[in-house]
Amino acid sequence: RVCVDVVGGDEKPQVVLDGIEAALAADPDIEVLAAGPAEIVNPFAASHARVEALEAPDVIAMDDDPIRAVMTKRKSSIVLSCRAIKKGNADAFFSAGSTGAMTAAATAYVTPFRYQAEGKKQPVRPCLTNALPNRAGGLTVLCDMGANPDVEVDDMVRFAQMGSAYARVVLGIEHPRVGLLANGTEDEKGSNFTKACFPAMKAAVPGFVGNCEGTDLTSGNFDVVVADGMSGNIALKATEGAAKFLLQEL
């Protein structure tokens, strides 16, 4: 059962509603919890057998402060959807809305993964992940793509572990090859931070190959590329920009 934010994205709600209909047609087992204003979700749910309405009168705008919006707009589609997962009323949540609000709401309302460190269980910070097509005909997982501009070494290790799990479970890659984004492939390359991450990832991440460069997002030499949110977002946007330029020129 998937909860969908119908007021997220630039062309809401019609594009989102069209997407829900396409998903229902493609998968007879899927059920949808449509979250949004009553005047949108109630008639839509009434006309679709596998759709239930989740009335959410508040709307988090793209330019809202993410943390403040999550704490004050408690009846927004993003917050109520995350709470639906927490309560077991949904298995997954999709939104094309505010990335920051999604991250903040997931952290606040969905029980995070935890790991043992310094004698207590620490929450794992969420990271943004996507799978990019590569020249070998497969996909390369990039994480983090922008959720966490400032991170610690332990965070990078967890990102690598989560990225590897995603590559195995979702992409079916039995032994993912993991790379650390740096300014060169040599072990000694990188900033002081990436140099600190290197031995930690080598010790804790099976399949860790070593440093990789921005070109390895599409080279096919790595299945998972790990970066802090700032570097990962820059690498992603640079790749997108280059692709758009080439398509325009060809």
Would you name each region that the model predicts?
Residues 222:
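Conserved beta-loop-beta/alpha segment of the NTase-like Rossmann-fold superfamily
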Residues 1-68, 74, 83, 87, ...:
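Anion-binding alpha/beta catalytic cores of soluble intermediary-metabolism enzymes, centered on
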